[in-house]
Amino acid sequence: MAVIFVLFFLVSMALSARIRPSFNGTALSGTSNKHPFEPGPNTIFREEVPPSAAASGFPSAHGTELRTHDPSIIKVGSIYYSYSVGPSITIHQAFSLDGPWTEVGALLSGESVIKKGDRKAPWAANTIYINGRYYCYYSVSNSGCRDSAIGVASSAFPGPGEWTDHGLIIQSGTGEGSDVFPLNQSNTIDPNVFVDGDGTAYLNFGSFWTGLWQVPLEEELVTVKGLQDGTLDAVHLAAEPGKVWRSKLANSKAKTVSTSKTGSPICGDPTGGHPIEGGFMAYHAPYYYMWFSWGRCCEFKDPAMRSNGKEYRIRVGRSTSARGPFVDKQGIDLVDGGGETVYGSNGDVFAPGGQGILTDEFGDILYYHYLNSSVSYDFADARLGYNRLEYVDGWPVAVY
């Protein structure tokens, strides 16, 4: 076994030696690493029960034993870093996407400085590297509510311990600026920052309600451009106009619903469930791709919720501009409910979503969290999976 592990380690190191840089923070090389990685007592090895072969046209997943939700992964030299939901944003390291993964600490030194939502365990981190510094964008909120905020922390190193929490960038529901369009009708969570070839940075965000939006950032990457002076240039990226399920408010006996200044409900959407979230922008010449998760992410203890076809799946649209419009194969705008499904439930892979794109010398990798239905449908058992991507006529196709 020791010989096998050594061989695996050497092969992994060789394969990761040539990584092309990406402004999106998806793959990096030649960056100093102040936190050397060694497997230890917190190491999580490859999945003991790998997902079974697909039976729905989708390939099986490369499954791992890393329990995670909404992962953000970058590669620095020969080491992969994963940032995910957990106390103060949990960081794991590995020499291979397959693992073994080791928890090495937290990104923040304590609670987020933003006084909203779940400050102890910020959601949906998105980490990028640019201009010699790492930036981790995160969100704080409460489930089912859009009284949310997006913050950012930065560091000269990707590991734990040396991050500065810059705090609030943008917020919805309540607080300064939340009455500005489109913040008065959107949900400021699931941040994703994309830096275009000309150096312009865009913050993509949104979950449920009116869907996914984009706003430009200032050059220092910690301030939204135009928010303070009334010149905010927001673009609507994607939406689910249909009512996929009834709102819980429809059966509520509550006399009042908490609302923002504009009258838009803060907790619960009386128009129904519009399950679109987790936007992630990537570039593969000559197109920009807007990836997102559609459907229900969690709460599958009820068997009926597992069989109605409304669980998470990964969709995409493309454009010739980072500002859109993004369309699917049929030419339907994502704002009008379009979206090409690239990966969904198959075999023991259930409800894949919370995705991102990682680029290495062999091409693009679609990574995500999913539930292994042969193990558990519990939220806490979501784990990291991934697939390679091929492009056919400019459209991404998941392969094993």
Swiss-Prot record:
Its localization reads:
Secreted
Q: Which reaction does it catalyse?
A: Endohydrolysis of (1->5)-alpha-arabinofuranosidic linkages in (1->5)-arabinans
Question: What UniProt keywords apply to this chain's record, in alphabetical order?
Answer: Carbohydrate metabolism, Glycoprotein, Glycosidase, Hydrolase, Polysaccharide degradation, Secreted, Signal, Xylan degradation
One GO-annotated biological process of the protein: arabinan catabolic process
Quote a single Gene Ontology cellular component term: extracellular region
**Active site residues per record:** 70 (proton acceptor), 277 (proton donor)
Identify the Gene3D superfamilies for this entry.
Glycosyl hydrolase domain, family 43
Predominant place of localization: secreted
EC code(s) of this entry = 3.2.1.99
* Database matches in Pfam families: Glyco_hydro_43
What SUPFAM superfamilies does its record include? Answer: Arabinanase/levansucrase/invertase (SSF75005)
CDD domains named among the record's database cross-references: GH43_AnAbnA-like
Signal peptide feature range = 1-16
* InterPro entries documented for this protein: GH43_arabinanases, Glyco_hydro_43, Glyco_hydro_43_endo_a_Ara-ase, Glyco_hydro_beta-prop_sf
Q: Indicate whether Hydrolase appears among the record's keywords.
A: yes
> What GO MF terms are annotated?
arabinan endo-1,5-alpha-L-arabinosidase activity
Pathway(s) per entry:
Glycan metabolism; L-arabinan degradation
What residues does the record give for site: Important for catalytic activity, responsible for pKa modulation of the active site Glu and correct orientation of both the proton donor and substrate?
Answer: 190
Glycan-carrying positions: 24, 184, 372
Q: Tell me its family.
A: Belongs to the glycosyl hydrolase 43 family.
> What is the role of this chain?
Endo-1,5-alpha-L-arabinanase involved in degradation of pectin. Its preferred substrate is linear 1,5-alpha-L-arabinan.
PANTHER family with a match to the protein in the record: ARABINAN ENDO-1,5-ALPHA-L-ARABINOSIDASE, ARABINAN ENDO-1,5-ALPHA-L-ARABINOSIDASE B
**Protein name as catalogued:** Arabinan endo-1,5-alpha-L-arabinosidase B
The coding gene here is abnB
